Amino acid sequence: MQNIITMQVLSATSEKGFSLDELVFRTKELFEKEGLASFVGLILELVDERICLKMVQGKIQDGSHACCLSPEYAHHDLTDRQFRTSVGKVIIRWRRLKCTGCGKTVIPLRQFLDLELYQSKSSELEKLVTEVVSEQSYRRSSSHMELIGSIPVAKSTAHRWVAQSDCDKLDSSDETLDLLFADGTGYKRRPDDDRDINNRGELRVALGVDKSGSIAPLGAFSGKSWKEIACAVNGRTDTDEPVADMLISDGERGLEQNLSVLCGDHQRCHWHLVRDLNYTMWQDTAGKLERKETQKELAAIIGIEIPEEDFEQVCDDDKDALEDAVAGAERDIRKLIGKLLDKGYQTAAEYLIRASKNMFGYARRWLKTGIVTPRVSSMIERMMRELARRLKRMAFGWSEDGAAKMARIIIKRFTSAGQWEKYWRERLRIQNNVMLVLRNIKAENPQTLGQ
């Protein structure tokens, strides 16, 4: 269906001069308030007229919604409808046809556009609102959209749209991941005295890295234990294979105990390892200077670097030297644990004993497979900083479900943009079925105005 649409705009400018800003402002005002929405509405009415005419003439049949064996349609009435979109409020009068045989009525344009029964907004507006509120609070988002984009959406309406959307759903795969990261951060949730729930909420996130190096978000959870999270992560696959080859964590006990069994190996984050030793020695009443010296000693022991060359180019002697360095580092760790025990630092010693089991998984994996594994959990830490920057500022008093949903939206947008855009391409049905071409913009001779 092709149509040539003519748009007439009357422009009147002062001969004494005007500012460029006023011209741009008035142009934007005209098209945002009237032009664009009216343009969309006109195209819809033209399509509606064409479809209904062909159905009444019997040239096309409503096969997917046929009411009887040989339906014949006649015009029944017109219904006013309006849709909220990013270009403004689109107002149309669509036709309702009635079958002369059985009396059933249909709205061809609604079926043609595949709209829901009581749909009052476009999906592209929902996408815009969701992306804006993932950056700032609902109140600020509402003001921002009206001020910058002239899109009035109340904060309660935006909240309802996001809560009802399934855009936070994450893709699943049976492929074994290369790496698994997990971490948590606190936020002030909505308290509930009846259920004995305080305002100290915790948001926990699991991320994976696949064999190609792409980040795969696995989920965001609030009010869930690490055991429940492990069950959810493990349930994403239907196979008995490990979820990931290597877990990289900060050593939190619940996380380590429940997620390490889902992976082939476990690597403790070296940065957290050194930092947390200071805290455990403080619990043992060690002095500040001694704590700092012990931290430096631990950092020197575990600072074993992987050769920069490709695995195939590293000679056997260098590989043997790396293996000997790991064995020597493990002996030094045992000596350090003995020193801590001799000084009565029981908490710090137990901390290193537990951590020593997974200190050098990255080196052993490289020696076995040639795959380089990070020694720190900086990737998940960066993601948690982004989440904390948003949620701790705007999620005050949120429910646990609301905070988890927004976290899934954020990690999907920022760690797997491909998933996010794929979802919305399918949802918006962008399939090159509409083409608009601006042929020309020209002015009429002023002498013909008013004729």
Question: Where are the regions a protein language model picked out?
Answer:
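Short cysteine-rich clusters marking metal-coordination/redox-active sites
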Residues: 65-68, 99-100
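Short, charged amphipathic recognition helices of the HTH superfamily
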Residues: 133-145, 332-333
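Acidic/histidine-rich catalytic cores and adjacent linkers
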Residues: 2-45, 49, 60-61, 67, ...
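Short, surface-exposed amphipathic charged segments that create phosphate/polyanion-binding patches used
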Residues: 194-199, 280-291
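Short, flexible, mixed-charge glycine/proline-rich loop motifs
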Residues: 52-64, 71-75, 87-93
